[in-house]
Each structure stands twice: as structure tokens, then as C-alpha cells.
Design a protein with these regions (language model features):
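N-terminal presequence-like segments and the immediate start of the first folded domain
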Residues: 1-84, 90-143
């Protein structure tokens, strides 16, 4: 079975990080998370502001997307540390890789240091032509 990477995490957010014995520790995500509680699920969230305008550049769009996710979570009584999964869709994988350091900084500033299970997928395009990234989020609020 697995062990929690941060024992204090279960006390504050009810989540257990699943890390198979002997596997290398992932950096910036979790291999799996176990949770019990109320499910909060977003649709595909893009990086536009309340006026429907996209920021300039990939990192700005990612930051706004993460801020938008936090706003949606709050509507359901969830916090960033309740996230159990993020699925990222990007139109340019090289753009993502080139900006890893800045993306990590933006992620930590918006979501903190909680890293849920994540997947990253490159797609041909997104529904919104100006969007460079779209993220689906799943959170579990402890009962």
C-alpha cells in the first residue's frame, strides 16, 4: 500500500496522498489521492477575466485560469487544498515546458504547495480561439 507524504495533510484537508512503495517521489503532483466528502467538479476553465478578456502570454493565462478555479471552488465551499485532480489541456507542450519555472511560481502563489493528481495533455486547439490552456478541476470537501 502507500503512505501519506505529509501526515499533517489528512488532518487539515481530509486527503491521503497515495505513493506506492519504491516509486520515485513525483515533483509538482501526486500519483494518486484518496478522499471522502462532498465532490466539487469544474468544467474546463480558461484564463479569461470577468470581462471575458484573455491575458497576454501563456503564464498570465495559467495564473488567471488557476484564480478562476479558486473562485469556482469557493462557490462550493472548497479550498485549493481540497483539490484531488487537475487535468491540463495546452495547445503547445513546448510553451508549457519552456515556462515551467514561472508556471511553478504562479501555481504556488495561487494554489499553495498542495499538489493533487495531475495530467497534462496537448491538444490541437481549445474552444476559445485565444485560450492557450484549459484546466478541469476536481476537489473533495471533507464532511
Amino acid at each position: 500500500m502507500s503512505t501519506m507524504t505529509k501526515p499533517e495533510a489528512a488532518a487539515t484537508n481530509g486527503l491521503q496522498v497515495l505513493q506506492p512503495s519504491g516509486w520515485p517521489q513525483p515533483k509538482g503532483y501526486a500519483n494518486g489521492i484518496m478522499a471522502e466528502g462532498r465532490l466539487v467538479v469544474t468544467g474546463g476553465v480558461v484564463g479569461w477575466d470577468v470581462a471575458g478578456r484573455f491575458g497576454d502570454g501563456f503564464v498570465a493565462q495559467v495564473r488567471q485560469t488557476l484564480e478562476n478555479i479558486v473562485a469556482i471552488l469557493a462557490e462550493g465551499g472548497a479550498r485549493p487544498d481540497h483539490l484531488v485532480r487537475l487535468t491540463w489541456y495546452v495547445v503547445d507542450m513546448d510553451e508549457y515546458i519552456t515556462n515551467l519555472k514561472a508556471l511553478g511560481k504562479a501555481y504556488r502563489e495561487v494554489l499553495g504547495t498542495h499538489y493533487p493528481s495531475m495530467a497534462l495533455v496537448q491538444v490541437v486547439r481549445l474552444v476559445e480561439p485565444s485560450a492557450r490552456v484549459e484546466i478541469e478541476a476536481t476537489a473533495v470537501v471533507p464532511r
